[in-house]
Curated annotation (Swiss-Prot):
Enzyme class at the top of the EC tree: transferase
Reactions catalysed according to its record: 5-(2-hydroxyethyl)-4-methylthiazole + ATP = 4-methyl-5-(2-phosphooxyethyl)-thiazole + ADP + H(+)
Main function: Catalyzes the phosphorylation of the hydroxyl group of 4-methyl-5-beta-hydroxyethylthiazole (THZ).
Region described as Disordered: 1-23
Cofactors (names): Mg(2+)
Annotated positions binding substrate: 67, 233
UniProt keyword annotations, A-Z: ATP-binding, Kinase, Magnesium, Metal-binding, Nucleotide-binding, Thiamine biosynthesis, Transferase
Pathway terms, separated by semicolons: Cofactor biosynthesis; thiamine diphosphate biosynthesis; 4-methyl-5-(2-phosphoethyl)-thiazole from 5-(2-hydroxyethyl)-4-methylthiazole: step 1/1
Gene (UniProt): thiM
Annotated protein name in UniProt: Hydroxyethylthiazole kinase
Length: 303
């Protein structure tokens, strides 16, 4: 699946470090604290391959998980959840109509939700589903660079829609750099905010140096571990944890907090592990043990 940050020592020489006393860091710390204290429920309509890691990561981060593949379950539980997570990594024929119904229900009832457009551009059914989400867009999009670029083209956003040079769909892995997706991510986030009841939206793009934007500000987040590319579901579980944070915070803060949590935790897990198997176990332990203060003090820059 899509993956979280991969390189701990990426170049940040052209970026502006966010100061320790910047208000955004306190908002991130408070969001992390609220998750630990409130154990918010975030439901997931996610793929078969990574569902176990998604649920365990949500629990380890401090939230409560509910997983379902029945559209009626998702719509019935939506009002009781702080947020919903939809991942299109594995599809069945009936999902084409079901996911449109779910997104319309969430939109009409003002429910916050996170979209992971896994493998955007691959297959007719997935393309139709993702195009349909434009009418009832999510609160947050969490993607890799290639997925963000493809979705930007699908939704025909911005002055350069359909003209950006990129490598196109590449299955579940990114074929483009995060830097190549800055304009696409910013346009997507602005579109989400425009159609949100609270006028807030965010896009998080995972890569060598993660990117999070609300359509105005662009944050970059170095850190993490290359071992995240060696376990299945790193990016998918980040989407689920982003939904957990979205249950207690706005789109920008939730996206930043979840990505910073993953960067801190994956770095700690790499130091404590000896390979992919022990890394995944150590990663879940790190999600559980990291403090709100450690999350809020993780490397954070403004582009």
């Amino acid at each position: 699946m899509t993956t979280a940050s991969t390189t701990p020592n990426s170049d940040t020489s052209n970026l502006h470090e966010v100061a320790p006393d910047d208000p955004i860091r306190e908002r991130i710390r408070q969001a992390a604290q609220n998750v630990r204290e409130q154990t918010p429920l975030a439901q997931s309509f996610t793929n078969f391959v990574t569902i176990n890691l998604v649920a365990n990561a949500q629990l380890a981060a401090g939230g409560t998980a509910a997983m379902s593949f029945l559209p009626n379950d998702v719509t019935s539980l939506a009002s009781s959840c702080g947020a919903t997570y939809i991942n299109v990594g594995t599809l069945l024929p009936f999902y084409r109509d079901a996911l449109q119904e779910i997104s319309e229900h969430l939109s009409r009832h003002g429910c916050k939700w996170v979209l992971d457009p896994v493998a955007a551009g691959v297959g007719v059914a997935r393309t139709e589903i993702l195009k349909g989400f434009k009418d009832y867009p999510p609160t947050v999009i969490r993607a890799n660079a290639s997925e963000a670029l493809v979705l930007h083209d699908m939704w025909q956003l911005g002055d350069a829609a359909g003209t950006d040079e990129h490598n196109g769909p590449a299955g579940v892995e990114a074929a483009d750099s995060v830097d190549a997706a800055i304009t696409a991510a910013t346009d997507l986030a602005a579109y989400l905010a425009l159609h949100s009841p609270t006028h807030t939206g965010a896009v998080a793009v995972s890569g060598e140096v993660d990117l999070v934007t609300d359509g105005r500000l662009v944050y970059r987040l170095p850190g993490g571990s290359a071992m995240m590319t060696k376990i299945t579901g790193a990016g998918c579980s980040l989407g689920g944890v982003t939904a957990t944070y979205l249950a207690v915070a706005d789109a920008l803060v939730a996206s930043l907090a979840a990505s910073m949590l993953y960067n801190v935790s994956s770095g700690a897990a790499e130091r404590a592990s000896h390979g992919p198997g022990s890394f995944q176990t150590a990663f879940l332990d790190a999600l559980w043990n990291v403090t709100p203060e450690e999350i809020a003090s993780a490397p954070l820059y403004l582009a």
